Every structure is written in C-alpha cells, then in structure tokens.
Amino acid sequence: MDLDQIVADAQQSFEGAADITTLENEKARFLGKSGALTELLKGLGKLDPETRKTEGARINVAKQQVEAALNARRQALADALLNQRLAAEAIDVTLPGRGAGAGSLHPVMRTWERVEQIFRSIGFDVADGPEIETDWYNFTALNSPENHPARSMQDTFYVDGKDADGRPLLLRTHTSPMQVRYARMNRPPIKVIAPGRTYRVDSDATHSPMFNQVEGLWIDENVSFADLKGAYTDFLKKFFERDDILVRFRPSYFPFTEPSAEIDMMFEHGKNAGKWLEISGSGQVHPTVIRNMGLDPERYIGFAFGSGLERLTMLRYGVQDLRLFFENDLRFLRQFA
C-alpha cells in the first residue's frame, strides 16, 4: 500500500486544478465514496487487529496530508479570485476626480430670503404664524363678515376640527392674519413683514393651490400712502437691482384696507419696458382691523401690502408659468443654482 504515492498524486492533482470545480472533481478521486483513500479505509476490516491498527494510523496520516493539500489549494484559488475581482474594481487614484453635485436654494426660497433681507435693512421685523388658522383671525378680524364670498368652499380649504370657540379651522388664504396676531403682542410703532405659505382653491398657469406670500404692515400715529409708496418703491429697486422702476397705485377693493390700491410697476428699459405689471395689493388699514388689533383707530393709522413671492420670482427671472416652481424638474431648477 503505497500511501506516499497516493499523497503525492493528490497534491499534484490539487495543485494542477485551475478552478474550484476541477478541484472538487480531483477531491472525489481521493476522498470521495470511491476514492483511493476511502477504498483503503474500507479494506481495513479484512486485516488482523494488530495490522489494522498500524495501517489505520498510516491511512489517517495520509488522509490528513491530502486534506491539508486540498484546503491549501482551495484557499489559493479563493485568494486568486478575490485578487482578480479587486483588480477589476480597482480605482486609479491618479485619474481626475468627479465634482460632487452641489445643492442650491429653490428660486422661490431665494426670493423669500431676499425679501426678508431687504425689509430688515429698512427697519422691518419678520414674523411667522400658523398655516392652520382660525376663522376669526383669517376673516372676521380682517373685516370679512360671515357671508363674505371668500369664506365659501370654492375659495377656502377647510379642515376637520374647531377652535376653542367652536368655529371652523382652515388653511390660511393669506398671511394677513399675522397683522392682528403681531399687533396684539407688540405696541406701535409696528413695522413687520410676514412671509409664508398660503392656500386657495385655484390652479392655472399663474395660480397654485399653495403659494407663498409676504404680508407687510406699518402702524404708527402718522403713516400715509406716501410712506407706503416710498417703502415699497425702495424695496422694488433693491429687489430687482435697478433704478429704472416706476410705481403706480390703482384704486381697488380689499375688505381689510380702506382706501385700497393695486400696486403696478414698470421698467423704463429692457425686455418689459413700457409694460405695467401688477405686483401687489395694498391699502390703508381699515379702522375695524386696527380696532381688532386692540388699538385705537382714532390715534393709530397704517398701511398694509401683500405680494406673492412666486409672482416676484417670475418677474425677476422671466418665468412664464407658475407651475414650473412646483414640478421639481432639475433641468429647470439648475438654471437658478
């Protein structure tokens, strides 16, 4: 029984195996059910006890040597496969790197921050309020009686639930409720803007069910339309970064201001030269609203204005369709990065 030859043959066969499949086939020749060493182990039963003990020990040593050679070759093949994969996935550190994509503000948020910065620079505070508003703050406090058309389901999103007095809750239709909320917590002189999201049942190229608005309020003992025109004209020139802007006031109607006016602007030069563009609603704060602020309308007077942040953004960047701001198309948004 030439065990040394069997071990040598096994080691040579294993070493010559180029892959795991071939190696397993070679293993069967020596360690399988009909393998050389297996057959020798089966034949031990025919030997006398003393010889069986001696030969059994020799066969087990040979088997251990074959298994050691088998495991060594398995590890070598596994290492070779790993090295091959690593080589295929290797990164050439000498290649130029790829620039990471940098995020940027949404164009409407750029406008939001710019509006805040400009009004802060001319002495206005910035306030924020709840988007789910009470019926009283959204309508009644702003001189909109209970039968006002704006309260209908066609224009306002009502939500489940009531306020502490049992009145309906709604998604605010403007940021104007902050006029009353802020004035009740601060004494005149009051100069504040309130940017924020608002909601109305409306959707087309120039309207969205959700849009952003900035409300402005100035309350003091001697405030006039001249102050409104001066402050808003100064804002427009800083926002659009140009001085060739004309501003006009057109009579209008808003329940919370009297008199009321639409604010139009016109560029004297450039693409939109000579065109009056509607930019904001405004007016002198209605005495009823001042009274609801907890102030004496015989003593205090002021003005308010409301501008759509999407509208300002559209005019600044020449965007024609409001809906583009909400479609999250990176091809569109990257233009403002």
From Swiss-Prot:
- Is Cytoplasm found in the keyword set? yes
Q: What's a single GO MF annotation on this record?
A: magnesium ion binding
Question: Which keywords has UniProt assigned to this entry?
Answer: Aminoacyl-tRNA synthetase, ATP-binding, Cytoplasm, Ligase, Magnesium, Metal-binding, Nucleotide-binding, Protein biosynthesis
Any Pfam family the entry gives: Phe_tRNA-synt_N
Per the annotation, which location comes first and is thus the protein's main one?
Answer: cytoplasm
**Gene3D superfamilies per the UniProt record, alphabetical:** Bira Bifunctional Protein, Domain 2
> Which biological process terms from the Gene Ontology are attached to this UniProt entry?
phenylalanyl-tRNA aminoacylation
Q: Does the keyword Hydrolase apply?
A: no
Residue positions annotated to bind Mg(2+) are E258
Intracellular or extracellular location(s):
Cytoplasm
Main EC class the enzyme belongs to: ligase
Documented EC number(s): 6.1.1.20
> What cellular component terms from Gene Ontology apply here?
cytoplasm
> InterPro entries, per this entry?
aa-tRNA-synth_II, aa-tRNA-synth_II/BPL/LPL, Phe-tRNA-synth_IIc_asu, Phe-tRNA_ligase_II_N, Phe_tRNA_ligase_alpha1_bac, Phenylalanyl-tRNA_Synthase, tRNA-bd_arm
Task: Report the cofactor remark.
Answer: Binds 2 magnesium ions per tetramer.
Organism domain of life: Bacteria
Enumerate the PANTHER family for this protein.
Answer: PHENYLALANINE--TRNA LIGASE, MITOCHONDRIAL, PHENYLALANYL-TRNA SYNTHETASE
Q: Which NCBIfam families match?
A: pheS
* Subunit relationships: Tetramer of two alpha and two beta subunits.
Q: What family does this chain come from, according to its entry?
A: Belongs to the class-II aminoacyl-tRNA synthetase family. Phe-tRNA synthetase alpha subunit type 1 subfamily.
Tell me what this protein is called: Phenylalanine--tRNA ligase alpha subunit
Q: Which organism is it from?
A: Burkholderia mallei (strain ATCC 23344)
Quick one: which gene encodes this? pheS
